[in-house]
């Protein structure tokens, strides 16, 4: 690649965690946005992961990890975990949020870049419900050399 004078860089927005709702399945999260680089010749895209899905009776499903296209190396993000231990999917540069505490159904936020959000926790055995937490935004890293 030579003489790239301009490029368009888009940083994918963080997906949101689903709400916990007493007496129902709660709400599903929102998928993360795509991060991309486009310079007129090359387009490289890291798609955001899919949202986790809320279901009735405690067990939600983790969302699929994001995919990548156009790079020399394209690494897919990890799938999020569901069930009693929900966890947002990890990326190469970030970690997904996680269900943190059984007693009060707390959830911990995602860290780094591209970490998946964690879904809300709904328990049939407790009046306490944990609210989902958002994921983290994507990142574009540019190395210039001559």
Locate each region found by the language model.
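Low-complexity, glycine/proline-biased repetitive segments and flexible coils/loops
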Residues: 1-146
């Amino acid at each position: 690649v030579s003489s790239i004078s301009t490029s368009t860089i888009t940083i994918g927005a963080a997906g949101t965690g689903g709400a916990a709702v007493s007496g129902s399945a709660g709400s599903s999260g929102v998928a993360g946005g795509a991060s991309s680089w486009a310079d007129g010749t090359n387009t490289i895209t890291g798609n955001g992961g899919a949202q986790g899905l809320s279901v009735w009776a405690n067990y939600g499903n983790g969302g699929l990890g994001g995919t990548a296209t156009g790079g020399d190396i394209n690494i897919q993000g990890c799938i999020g975990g569901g069930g009693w231990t929900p966890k947002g999917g990890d990326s190469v540069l970030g970690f997904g949020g996680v269900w943190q505490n059984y007693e009060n159904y707390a959830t911990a936020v995602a860290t780094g870049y591209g970490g998946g959000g964690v879904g809300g926790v709904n328990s049939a055995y407790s009046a306490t419900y944990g609210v989902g937490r958002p994921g983290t935004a994507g990142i574009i890293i540019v190395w210039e050399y001559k």
